Amino acid sequence: MATKGDEVLSQFTQTVVEEEVEVRDEDKLRIGIIGTGWIAESHIESYKRMKDVKVVAMADLIPGKAEKFAARYGIENCKFYPDHKSMLDSEKLDAVSVCTYNTQHAPCAIYALEKGVNVLLEK
């Protein structure tokens, strides 16, 4: 049996979800992507659907790979780095997606956490 509180919460949630909210660029979460292989594809697709998130930096060990990845997904005004350390040392990020080979997850995640950056990581 639904209570009055359940009804109010349902109406509020529906209103919040349906309402389009414009988020200023400076208020968006700043995301960096480490590794631009196939795992990064699902991450970037999700980020592109979020209005309060902006991918601002990418790092990949293979020269030119991050630039091609960004172009393929229409990511503009993004900076590119040859490795995760140079990106994390240079950018003010809210979070990073670690999309590297499993053997590189720990070093990338630990370095980001030591810099005070939140980490999104699969496995």
Give the predicted meaning of each segment.
Residues A2-Y73:
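N-terminal Rossmann-like dinucleotide-binding module
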Residues C78-E122:
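Beta-loop-alpha module in the N-terminal Rossmann-like domain of NAD(P)-dependent dehydrogenases
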Residues M1, V8-L9, H84, A109:
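Extended hydrophobic/Leu-rich segments
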